[in-house]
Amino acid sequence: MSKILIRAMVLPMTGPEDFYPEGEIGIENDRILFVGEKGSAPDSFIPDQIIDLPEDVVMPGLINTHTHAAMTMLRSYADDLPLMPWLQTKIWPFEDKMSDEDIYWGTLLALGEMIQSGTTTMLDMYASMDQVAKAVLEAGTRGVLSRGLIGNAPNGERAFAENMDLVKNYHGAGQGRIQVMFGPHAPYTCSGEFLQRVKQEADRLGVGIHIHVAETEDEIKTIKEQYGKTPVQWLEELGLFGGHVVAAHCVHLTEEDQEIMAQNKVFIAHNPESNMKLNSGTAPIPELRSRGVVVGLGTDGTSSNNNLDMFGEMRSAAFQQKLVKGATALPAYEVLQMATVDGARTLGLHDVGVLAPGYKADLISINFDQPHFYPRFSIPAHLVYVAHAGDVRTVMVDGKILMQERQLMTIDIKRVCREVEKRAKGIAQGL
């Protein structure tokens, strides 16, 4: 058994007023035993290791609720294009040439970047997900994995079978660090019959569904022309909602769509930087939250972002809403909730996202002893409006240190970078 005592400023994300300027966190193996002010450790707690971080803020690890990790292979390959030309002329042709090994190395690069920027959990959608699982297990992070399913593609049935195998082989793997969902790509790439089969199998196997919904105006137009309804209305008619569904983007929603989301308890993965870069639009996040919809935060893939920095994503989420809705829209603490506790709820993870007794020891420390963090009137405001990836000092998942003093402990990042550079350039040259 391993016992660790961390001394630091602690933001547990258990409530807006909860903050310990001189705090302590006790960890036993993979779980948090106690969180509180200095001196709150019980006499019976004798740590094997003490980590003193007096100038750091320790908070829950960040949760990326929508990404395509291996798309690090395509970073800066296709920029400054709208979604459909971007997908059809650049992204899909490149992805067709990617091997299983390419996806493994691309994912490992993404996980290194995530750890260095304070992300401990991701919801991923891609192909060759056994390779993604392999990378997650090696890196030591937490991952909810879904095989991307384009039902209308020639390999749609094979991909469907691969998603079922993914559930069988990896759901609960890594002492529970890996969970699995089904990943139908979008309403415009899957037939109604295909989506109903996905729903049936997801219910049978007891897993969730991860799908892109209402990302662009073109999608709305296409689905209305085909079915006479918005994508959200059509998916409800099909019966896709009702279980655990994570809908990514949800930029273009009518009032009726928003009410459907609320009534069916659909979870939203909000990706503001990708939505801005691809000119998809501004999602109605304050309106959804006011209806009780749980909204998490995601980066999308690095080919449409172009990084995996959740601190930057938080800042963009706040600023985009303030530009469109007013200065009081989406305050800092609410954005932090989206990146932590509400991210955990979005992924169906009930023991991460806050620092509290019984929860998993998934946490990060941010070095606040830097000029841009003074004066310290508001810790949440600094985390959302000031902090960036390079401020993260320590990362822990399941009580294991994955990064210490910015040094990755589980990934040879220089080797990974060289491998990805070689592989990505090789694919691009062949197109």
UniProtKB/Swiss-Prot annotation:
The keyword Cytoplasm does not apply. One of its GO terms (molecular function) is metal ion binding. The keyword Hydrolase applies. Substrate binds at residues 95, 147, 185, 215, 300. It catalyses: S-adenosyl-L-homocysteine + H2O + H(+) = S-inosyl-L-homocysteine + NH4(+); S-methyl-5'-thioadenosine + H2O + H(+) = S-methyl-5'-thioinosine + NH4(+). Keywords: Hydrolase, Metal-binding, Zinc. Disulfide bonds: none annotated. Its cofactor is Zn(2+). Binds 1 zinc ion per subunit. Zn(2+) binds at residues 66, 68, 212, 300. CDD domains: ATZ_TRZ_like (cd01298). Gene3D superfamilies: Metal-dependent hydrolases, Urease, subunit C, domain 1. Its EC number is 3.5.4.28, 3.5.4.31. Catalyzes the deamination of 5-methylthioadenosine and S-adenosyl-L-homocysteine into 5-methylthioinosine and S-inosyl-L-homocysteine, respectively. Is also able to deaminate adenosine. Belongs to the metallo-dependent hydrolases superfamily. MTA/SAH deaminase family. PANTHER family: AMIDOHYDROLASE-RELATED DOMAIN-CONTAINING PROTEIN, AMINOHYDROLASE SSNA-RELATED. HAMAP family: MTA_SAH_deamin. This is 5-methylthioadenosine/S-adenosylhomocysteine deaminase. The lineage of its organism: Bacteria, Bacillati, Bacillota, Clostridia, Eubacteriales.
